[in-house]
């Protein structure tokens, strides 16, 4: 006679072992998530478009907006390398560029010119050759270039004529090279006539301050509203040439807008449009 089932044996109970499996499942999911996050962290998101920004102090103010716009798509990784005093004719630029290119960017976003104006205006042809040399070095590392023009300047600075000469050089560079694309920053930061403005309609559809105020006077540097508009301009250009989807909603209101650079000098981005 076969022994009967021991009803006191847990293994003999209906569904025995299922609860143990159900207990392990969440742990497996968590472990896989950790492995995936470690992979992304160590590879830096190898499938994302590698972008670097370079330029002067105006570009420095624009960098957080460019980074926010591009990274909000999940398809780009942005290294921001702009700082005050950068120019093609300034000491140390070649070493600065080599260091940036050593990281293998696929796209280089450039915005500069203010520190080059004296030499540029004095000898535009020589500056054009310098532009070609710099573009050759970027292309030689496999990068394409988005060259942003100098934004409209406050009339008080008295550099508008020189700015036009500089932007003419950047336009000409893009015209003779397939690996360089020129972007008109006046479209993003200018008023209705493309000239300087302190305020304009921002990405949220309301009027925002786009340029700083310094000592009560208009200044050429950017506020978060201007940086966001610049980021949107760059994103639009990249999406024309790369498979990049839509950014997350209202990325222009994220934490980057509280960066300390937008309160330098204090209150510079707190002007009222009234």
Regions found by a protein language model. Name each.
Residues 1-19:
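N-terminal Lys/Arg-rich, disordered targeting/topogenic segments
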Residues 15-30:
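N-terminal Sec-pathway targeting helices
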Residues 35-49, 64, 242-245:
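C-terminal region of N-terminal signal peptides and the immediate post-cleavage residues
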Residues 47-129, 256-273:
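Conserved SGNH/GDSL esterase-like catalytic core that processes O-acyl groups on lipids
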Residues 124-133, 162-167:
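Charged helix-capping and loop-helix junction motifs
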Residues 140-144:
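A short helix->loop->beta-strand "cap" motif at the edges of active sites that frequently abuts
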Residues 154-274:
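Catalytic His-Asp segment of secreted/periplasmic serine-dependent ester chemistry enzymes
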